[in-house]
Regions:
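N-terminal pre-domain/capping segments
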Residues: 1-99, 117-120, 127-130, 137, ...
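Active-site-proximal loop/turn and secondary-structure-junction residues that shape catalytic pockets
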Residues: 5-7, 36-38, 70-73, 104-108, ...
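Acidic/histidine-rich catalytic cores of soluble enzymes
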Residues: 31-32, 67, 130-232
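Glycine/Thr-rich phosphate-binding loops of Rossmann-like dinucleotide-binding domains
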Residues: 42, 110, 210
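Active-site groove signature of glycoside hydrolases
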Residues: 92-118, 139-152
Length: 232
């Protein structure tokens, strides 16, 4: 289970990521995915916080196969984003977590005046994704990215990204349900990317046609205007 699965419970401060690890063990799982960013809830450094979580997971007998954090290389200063991401790679390396998942791009940044094409985005981010993969290789960590964020979420676009990065230390975190968000058949999409998969998020979706009425609370709109809702 990912610590992100408990995200709503962290908001009031009464439930922590340490509690999430305990609950993961209680559910009978064998491992936990640590999802962390640049801030910590207790004032410790990201390195200190991650090490404490990792140690707690190990005390509970849980494996920590992957470290997840955000990233966005389609920005005005991608060099700074690469430097920031490398600090998270250092954390994963120090904790001996073998895999790190990072985002690639979240959308067109404010002030962008170029052609709004995902191909332009791929062209811009590839050098930095590749540099992150190489830096991680030197630290004994493998990097990966997920079909996530609308802009680079379809299987065809992800395939273009992996072909362009072309680095043996960079793979695909396959979210089985996220293809629904861009109106793609999940089974077909997963099959197309199977050679690149290094980690999987198991997820199922409820889907309703956008030609019908809004099904209500909990449903979101896909890129094509259909309704979807996660079930796991």
């Amino acid at each position: 289970i990912s610590t992100y699965s408990f995200e709503r419970l962290y908001q009031d401060g009464g439930f922590t990521r340490f509690d999430a690890i305990d609950k993961t063990k209680e559910y009978g799982c064998q491992g936990v995915e640590l999802v962390l960013d640049d801030k910590t809830p207790d004032g410790s450094t990201p390195m200190e916080y991650a090490k404490a979580l990792y140690a707690h997971a190990k005390e509970q007998g849980l494996e920590v196969p992957i470290y997840t954090t955000g990233a966005n290389f389609f920005v005005k200063e991608p060099e700074k984003e690469l430097e920031r991401l490398c600090r998270h790679i250092d954390i994963a390396a120090e904790c001996k977590i073998p895999l790190l998942r990072h985002d690639v791009a979240w959308g067109y940044y404010e002030g962008y005046t170029g052609i709004k094409s995902y191909k332009k985005v791929i062209e811009a981010v590839v050098p930095f994704v590749r540099q992150a993969a190489e830096y991680a290789r030197e630290r004994g960590v493998k990097t990966c990215s997920e079909n996530h964020g609308y802009l680079l979420q379809d299987s065809a676009r992800m395939l273009e990204l992996f072909a362009a990065v072309d680095h043996p230390n960079y793979g695909f975190l396959c979210d089985m349900g996220n293809f629904t968000v861009v109106d793609e058949d999940c089974a077909t999409a997963v099959s197309a990317l199977s050679d690149y998969i290094v980690h999987v998020h198991a997820k199922d979706m409820l889907v309703r046609s956008g030609m019908n009425f809004d099904p209500g609370k909990g449903y979101n709109l896909s890129r094509g205007g259909n309704y979807w809702r996660g079930t796991i």
